[in-house]
Amino acid sequence: MRKVILLFLLFLSVDTVRTQGQNITFSHLTTDDGLSQFSVNSMYIDEQGIIWIGTREGLNRYNGNDIKSFKLKKNDPNSLFSNTVLRITGNRNGKVYLLCTDGVAEFDLATQRFKTLLQGNVDAIYFNEKLYIGKREEVFVYNESTGNFDLFYLSLIHISEPT
């Protein structure tokens, strides 16, 4: 319910969404418009000005006219591997990164295909020149040349209960 209220307040405070690639204007989007699910977890605007919306029922792409939904398709390695999209970010160079309940995925704007980068519990994703993920008290950075996540930071702080 909290996310619905936040989404409502967001739409009240923003009359239009302006992007670098194109001007997209809307007052609200619903499942009647094609949104896969009403509860929105995350939004991201890519370098082409497309709005990406993450929900509990998949990823949605809004181009100003139409919504296209991407969902898990069994036995299709190029589809989204988990329907619950928690966070979205991108590299402004053709890649959109997704934090899902089951790991991290990459969507290639050129090929329109998904690639699973990491399966398992991930707490956060962030992009700043490189893709970073947070797992418990560790931060990993994605190495595109190897396809691996390398340890970037390990918390050595341990606070114990007073005795």
What are these regions (language model features)?
Residues 1-160:
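Carboxylate-rich, polar loop motifs that coordinate divalent cations or form catalytic acidic clusters
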